[in-house]
């Protein structure tokens, strides 16, 4: 209860175990692959959350889909502990590869209540027709920390690329996360994800680039700059 990390779970749709008061959340297990036509791949398990001091566990990757089916989605990253200084939420798992549609990435975990950065959103999986969408990055702590970057959209071979995920929101001091790039598509590219907003001293995240295709995807909008320094942000001051 007081010390210890969650177990790493490795079974079909396994969920990472929660940590003690001091420890890291367990990673989510990968979803099982499907070898049967028309059967969806298993979803990745969510990463376990930390309680007070510790980072969140990473989400598991989605399993690949059987012939003509959809891949499993990536699991969500676990949230960091409430008082975890400087530790990020867990990264979201990537979507699996699909013979039809790629799986969606799992969202990044949020930082602790006050200090820490958001976890990176998982990337969308490749699809023979349509790419899976990237997931949103996690939000930072209220006082210090930057938002997590959005995951990139997966590529779609014959149709559309997946959209990029949105960047996470920053804390009072920190930058918004960058939006994920849209995936390339044989027909049309996926749209880039919007950048996350900054609230005080920090820059808004950059919007993700649109994916390439017969018709290119639209770039994502940039996030708003912090209110203490104006919409232009303050380049170079914050990492």
Briefly describe each language-model feature range:
Residues 1-239:
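Long, compositionally biased tandem-repeat segments
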